[in-house]
């Protein structure tokens, strides 16, 4: 059970407001994509507020048959005692793009914690872009996320995560004032073969996050996990050169995942825009490699 994670041992007290996981704090979302003759459709949609999805739209000019889904929250952010669960299921030969409406704000907490579990299943020859907006942890917030991926060897997943240092421009600034951010990602093939696990725990009060070997002088962390067949991963890896440019405030690099699972791309930056732009470059290259489709111009408001 995610709430029993070791790093949450000090945050088991109940909020004085609504009880943990009660109505309005126990969000659930299930998205099921199926193939139709002309395109992929969002065939299954189950939702429980605060997580909301209205419908799939087809606005991607590079892939006109790609259903694009925005996850919306009507809660104004993730609050103490919230328990979120998201399930995304792609049938064979389907394609989908999933994002969030805006940045995910993890609100300030004085009791308990918040969790989110994500379960993603990709069938044969399926393709998923899961590109949420950044996560902004507020002062004293505690958040644990666990992502479980089951993927067919012929499928592709582009999964990104951007973590801000906090509300950098709020008042005198909140940089690494949150209590806990924990994120675990595990991937396995559909036959049960485990591919890899990555987990990082950030507890700024227990260690200097700005030290060498961690964030250094950077404020934004970007993580892109590309699960794809080895032939695609090999070609993409050869095109990615590491960058470390303090004048521009950006650094990135790529490495291969264990068991020929794909690639891992990490970015550090001072602001979110350059980090997201770097992730977008890899996303664009991966889409071109796997689907031969282009990525449309970014929206002016994105």
UniProtKB/Swiss-Prot annotation:
InterPro entries linked to this entry: UreD
Gene Ontology cellular-component terms listed: cytoplasm
Keyword Zinc: no
Protein name: Urease accessory protein UreD 2
Gene: ureD2
Signal peptide coordinates: none
Function in brief: Required for maturation of urease via the functional incorporation of the urease nickel metallocenter.
Family assignment from sequence similarity: Belongs to the UreD family.
Origin species: Brucella canis (strain ATCC 23365 / NCTC 10854 / RM-666)
Description of how the protein assembles with itself and partners: UreD, UreF and UreG form a complex that acts as a GTP-hydrolysis-dependent molecular chaperone, activating the urease apoprotein by helping to assemble the nickel containing metallocenter of UreC. The UreE protein probably delivers the nickel.
Localization of this protein: Cytoplasm
Keyword terms, alphabetized: Chaperone, Cytoplasm, Nickel insertion
Pfam families reported in the protein's UniProt record: UreD (PF01774)
Record GO terms (molecular function): nickel cation binding
Predominant cellular place of this UniProt entry's protein: cytoplasm
